[in-house]
Amino acid sequence: MSAIVDIVGREVLDSRGNPTVECDVLLESGVMGRAAVPSGASTGSREAIELRDGDKSRYLGKGVLKAVEHINTEISEAVLGLDASEQGFLDKTLIDLDGTDNKSRLGANAMLAVSMAVARAAAEESGLPLYRYLGGMGSVQLPVPMMNVINGGAHANNSLDLQEFMIIPVGAPSFREAVRWGAEVFHALKKIIHDKGMSTAVGDEGGFAPSVENHEAAIQLILQAIEAAGYTAGEQIALGLDCAASEFYKDGMYVLEGEGGLQLTAQQWTDMLASWCDKYPIISIEDGMHEGDWDGWKILTERLGHNVQLVGDDLFVTNTKILKEGIDKGIANSILIKINQIGTLTETFAAIEMAKRAGYTAVISHRSGETEDSTIADIAVGTNAGQIKTGSLSRSDRIAKYNQLLRIEEDLGDIAFYPGRAAFYNLR
């Protein structure tokens, strides 16, 4: 038995300089697991609740001392003596202890830090790398990275409404090569932006945030960079968008400031997205509609769902109850998986499994406020998810995940598998 003998929570900083929760879990054998949780900028209204102190005299009210105290008192008392290898039982203990639907009493940030740290400790105890511990011998598939090279929306101070413009190396023969392709396009893009006299400063997720005239201009910059780096857009490197449409939905209309204040109905906005998909090699669109606009989602899915991956992030918030409703109604064809949206590893894996059974893809994702913790890299391989979103090719909080995936690919050796375009099995 891998008995838990000590738990220590602490307040540390994330990549934006805001406090977040870190947890150490010590086992009887002397083995320790450590994990730190991320935090989002644009969040879904039905996400599990991240507990913040609200004390304006510390960190502008964003301190997490209450969440840390919950780890060091209540949670510690409840889990000391439990077997760290019983992840499901441990997570259920945390959920029952919290007693709310949205983890608002203890805080999803406190619960997730413990859940992740326990898994790390148990993996260490078993002598297995985390991805193998989580997924077993069948965990051999590396994820296709969706690399956020231009930022807009809530992640940048420019005129772009859409939050992320991504490159997807679908034609790469391996994960290592996919990362190289992405890095080379990133550097080509930096040169193009610089040569146009625009800022090459990067946003929260490591992508550039140039002030361009409209969204198509941003797409065209990326296409130029792909070509300049020596690759073929579409065949080798596809494009993805994260609209984060809940952020520009006002009074039932989609208001695009970056398109001159254009106000569009869901049907008109779908038409615009469809026209971009016809013109450019876009194979994935995330949060194309407001999280509450299920009629809009239905229009979008019926129009584009056969040949474009439509990812629900704010829509599904990694929640099986909401995902099941979406599957039943034929809404979207993919779910974004953010561990802190739901608050435990067990519930995260349940959402991935439900998506796969329904023929939906599951895209493992970072948050805009990250740490050096690379657990999501191991989750991506451990669950054979096939896709990961973990930012651009800069900032060590993003690179930490790419580097961990490079190590995993090396560890797997000849049995490592990079799916490329096959990761988009929801498209026909």
Swiss-Prot record:
Major location category of this protein: cytoplasm
Binding residues for (2R)-2-phosphoglycerate: 163, 338, 367-368, 389
Active site (catalytic residues): 205, 338
This protein's pathway: Carbohydrate degradation; glycolysis; pyruvate from D-glyceraldehyde 3-phosphate: step 4/5
SMART domains given in the database record: Enolase_C, Enolase_N
Listed PROSITE patterns: ENOLASE
EC number(s) per entry: 4.2.1.11
Single Gene Ontology MF annotation: magnesium ion binding
Function per UniProt: Catalyzes the reversible conversion of 2-phosphoglycerate (2-PG) into phosphoenolpyruvate (PEP). It is essential for the degradation of carbohydrates via glycolysis.
Protein family membership: Belongs to the enolase family.
PANTHER family xrefs: ENOLASE (PTHR11902:SF1)
Protein name: Enolase
Organism from which the protein derives: Acidovorax sp. (strain JS42)
Lineage summary: Bacteria, Pseudomonadati, Pseudomonadota, Betaproteobacteria, Burkholderiales
Gene: eno
